[in-house]
Curated annotation (Swiss-Prot):
Protein name as annotated: Protein sip5
Species: Aspergillus fumigatus (strain CBS 144.89 / FGSC A1163 / CEA10)
Keywords per UniProt: Cytoplasm
Record PANTHER family: PROTEIN SIP5
GO CC terms: cytoplasm
Reported function: May negatively regulate the snf1 kinase.
Subcellular location: Cytoplasm
Compositional bias segments (type: Basic and acidic residues): 34-44, 61-97, 172-187, 317-326, 554-582, 732-747
Keyword Cytoplasm among UniProt keywords: yes
Similarity-based family: Belongs to the SIP5 family.
Keyword Cytoplasm: yes
UniProt biased composition (Polar residues): 244-255, 796-812
Length: 812
């Protein structure tokens, strides 16, 4: 039965809900709790709610997820709609205020000179304007002429097109108000009575107020004035006492001043109020608009400034102090500065835009009449309640005397009661500074923790060490030092970490235990001690970081220096190789030229020798250019030495002196391009090249047909070469014993070292043919070639001659 009743009971509920939702979505959109959303979105969300109650769990969960996603997506849209609504409300409130409220012909809302955000306190600004301590927001004129008539001034002040001087538009026509009679003055006196809500009304006041209640209310009346003027005036004694004793809100509302409207009087001294205000218009030096002469005056330099420009001037955002100066003239921030010693953000007071003096403030001298809104508790209005200023009365009977027009000679203090500073219209600057300091402290703490964690995590050698992470620096340093001793090449095993570990262990061993005992004994340690320890930790960490950076920079500088040294060594080596190669090319150019100038029939043996000599100039050449001599067998080497011996024996009878004289200058000229260190590598190819060069030089001198045996001692008397031939040396050694000896001779060409030392590899490659008769002749040929081609510069060479070679020479 219960289930059937439930089944019968649910459909009407759901249908009624559905109908109500449909009606609400189509007709009354504002009655829904989701009225701030878009029409389609609100109807869709309202239509989905009955389904959630009817369907099962599965469908509701899916729709719930979709609804949550939808709410996340429309959060920014709701914020934008909220801001749009606030802006529309401000526009409507501005229109209403400009239509119904004014202070002495000025307004309580801005006139749109600046389109930025109005971040000043509007309630404080409104109160100061109603108290006549700050100039109202006058309507600014783009142009002004002193010759304008009254209706032209009225049109300009109301924002209408300026008519011709002799033409008065119908909307600007006015009639002088008639003089008020005695009956007409009584309602004004009754209206200007100060409503006293803290005590009961007297019988006379109640009778007078109840007799003419309609005439006591001015028109138009603001909502605030109507709400505060009707109920307190007609409230009985019992209600007053009850409100004082039971309502806390009532006591707070009674303590605030009440706004009342003065009687409507559009004339001042028989003139329209617009014409009276703007007949002596003055220009604001900041926005360059023309305003009534009743403007704010700066306290320091007595310059005029309109209220709309004044409320735009504010303190700069909180920032670190410049030039090491502390925040001046900020007594309210002394406590904050003491509490935030580590976050030294300051908020300097605004400076005067004219004389750049700090603590910018203004003073205001109101016009000599009162119109519009006033505070009921304003003591300056009490003497005039019985004699209100009429349009026909003189200015002398006004409440405040007009200004004398004389400029103030001295500046006023920022603490003067008549001075309104920029901090007065923005009283939240201290809270903003505190919030900025707190935010900076949080960011600093987060950055410090992040840097500390990054440093400690990077100092571990592996990921396993990160699990042992703790806030104790000494323990972390000890663990990292133990784990990183094997890996000396890692970054954390550098001297920087050792220095940092040493720096962290500067404290005494009992410091940590003392701090731990203090922490257990005092659960809430003093704030100063914790801040001091935190500052010490920060200083210690900064010192550690500075040492680490210094060591890292020194290591980087050392690596750069080593790299530069390696580059310089490589560059010098390349230059040496290039110079050596160039020296070889220049040294053998004349020899190749002399060999190419031979006019003799080509022979196979001669061609082989020539190709071998040409390959010496570039030792890195391809194997097809004559390097196959290195890879020949000892038999082939012996055959080549035999051929060179036969060629040398045919030319033994030639006198070498003319050839030596001819090649002297060429050797001297080629020596000018060589350096003593440019020596080719010792190779046995040098022997064949030298033999071919000596043969080519000997063939050139065969045209003189000199005959006779070669005298080895004759070479020692040459003026250009200071040496003895190898044959003479061998001849001299025959007279001695059969042991081997070293003969120190001086050669005049750097390449002689290679040619002399190249005999040793030949002897090593031909061990079986060292006793053949062809070997001494080849050695003598090489020596002759060396003697003929050596330049002046000499180097000491040692030639080792065995006894077998000397015996073979003796037999020849």
């Amino acid at each position: 039965m219960g289930n059937s009743q439930t089944k019968e009971f649910r459909p009407p509920l759901s249908s009624s809900n559905r109908r109500s939702h449909q009606w609400g979505s189509s007709s009354s959109h504002g009655r829904s709790p989701y009225s701030d959303r878009h029409h389609a979105e609100s109807s869709r969300s309202r239509g989905s709610r009955p389904d959630l109650s009817i369907l099962g769990i599965g469908g509701s969960s899916e729709r719930d997820v979709a609804t949550l996603e939808h709410r996340r997506e429309t959060k920014q849209e709701r914020e934008a709609r909220r801001l749009e609504k606030e802006r529309a409300a401000r526009v409507k409130e501005r229109e209403r205020s400009m239509r119904e409220e004014h202070v002495d012909g000025g307004y309580l809302v801005t006139q749109g000179v600046y389109v930025g955000t109005e971040d000043f306190n509007k309630a404080v600004t409104r109160q100061l304007m109603i108290e006549r301590r700050l100039a109202p927001f006058w309507r600014g004129l783009n142009d002004f002429s002193e010759s304008w008539t009254e209706h032209q001034l009225m049109a300009a002040a109301r924002g209408l097109p300026i008519p011709p001087p002799d033409e008065i538009p119908p909307e600007l026509e006015y009639k002088n108000p008639p003089k008020l009679s005695g009956d007409g003055k009584e309602p004004s006196i009754q209206h200007l009575m100060v409503p006293i809500t803290s005590r009961s009304q007297s019988y006379g006041s109640e009778a007078s107020q109840s007799s003419t209640p309609a005439h006591s209310l001015p028109a138009p009346v603001s909502p605030i004035a109507s709400g505060t003027s009707t109920s307190p005036l007609f409230r009985s004694r019992a209600k007053t006492l009850a409100s004082l004793t039971t309502s806390k809100l009532g006591s707070q509302s009674d303590s605030t001043p009440k706004e009342i409207h003065l009687p409507e009087d559009p004339f001042v001294n028989g003139q329209p109020i617009e014409a009276y205000l703007y007949k002596d218009a003055t220009e604001c030096p900041i926005c360059f608009l023309y305003y009534p002469p009743y403007l704010n005056r700066t306290r320091c330099c007595d310059q005029p400034i309109c209220s709309e420009c004044f409320v735009q001037i504010k303190r700069p955002d909180p920032h670190p102090p410049e030039h090491g100066e502390a925040e001046p003239n900020a007594a309210a921030a002394e406590g904050d500065r003491q509490d935030n010693q580590d976050c030294q953000l300051v908020s300097e007071p605004a400076a005067c835009p004219f004389c750049v003096q700090p603590e910018f403030g203004v003073t205001y001298t109101p016009p000599p009449f009162r119109r519009g809104l006033v505070y009921a508790t304003d003591p300056t209005l009490r003497p005039n309640f019985t004699s209100p200023v009429s349009s026909t009365s003189s200015l002398a009977s006004a409440n405040a005397s007009p200004g004398t027009g004389r400029r103030r000679a001295t500046s006023l203090s920022a603490n003067d009661p008549a001075v309104i500073t920029t901090d007065r219209v923005r009283p939240d600057w201290a809270q903003k500074l505190a919030n900025a300091r707190a935010h900076a402290a949080r960011r600093s703490a987060a950055a410090t923790a992040l840097h500390t964690a990054a440093y400690l995590m990077n100092s571990t050698a592996s990921g396993n060490e990160s699990r042992n992470f703790s806030l104790g620096r000494r323990g972390v340093m000890r663990r990292t030092g133990q784990s990183e001793t094997p890996s000396a090449s890692s970054r954390s095993g550098s001297p920087a970490l050792q220095a940092l570990a040493f720096l962290t262990d500067r404290r005494t061993p009992g410091h940590d235990t003392d701090s731990a005992e203090e922490g257990t004994g005092n659960l809430a340690p003093p704030r100063n001690s914790s801040r001091r320890s935190r500052i010490d930790d920060l200083e210690e960490m900064m010192m550690m970081e500075a040492i680490r950076l210094s060591l890292a920079s020194e290591e980087e500088r050392r690596k750069k220096a080593e790299k530069e040294a390696r580059k310089e060594a490589k560059r010098r080596e390349k230059e040496n190789k290039k110079a050596e190669k160039a020296a070889r090319k220049h040294g053998f150019y004349s020899n190749n030229a002399s060999s190419s100038a031979l006019d003799v029939p080509s022979d196979a043996r001669l061609g082989r020798v020539a190709s071998t000599s040409s390959s010496i100039t570039g030792e890195d050449a391809s194997p097809s250019k004559g390097k196959e001599v290195d890879r020949t067998s000892p038999a082939a080497t012996a055959a080549s030495s035999q051929s060179s011996t036969e060629i040398a024996s045919e030319s033994m009878t030639i006198n070498p002196h003319p050839n030596v004289v001819e090649q002297g200058p060429s050797a001297q000229s080629s020596m000018a391009q060589l350096s003593p260190r440019e020596l080719p590598k010792p190779s046995h190819l040098r022997q064949v090249s030298s033999a071919s060069s000596s043969f080519s030089s000997l063939v050139e001198s065969t045209g003189e047909d000199h005959s006779g045996a070669y005298d080895g001692n004759a070479s020692s008397t040459e003026p250009l070469f200071n040496f003895r031939s190898l044959a003479a040396v061998i001849g001299d050694e025959d007279k001695g014993d059969g042991t081997a000896e070293h003969v120190e001779d001086t050669s005049s060409k750097p390449s002689a070292e290679g040619s002399a030392s190249s005999t040793a590899p030949v002897a090593d490659e031909m061990p079986g043919q060292s006793t053949t008769p062809a070997d001494p002749i080849a050695v003598k040929t090489v020596a002759e070639d060396r003697d003929c081609l050596m330049p002046k510069e000499l180097e000491t060479q040692s030639v080792e001659i065995t006894s077998a070679t000397r015996n073979a020479e003796a037999t020849t």
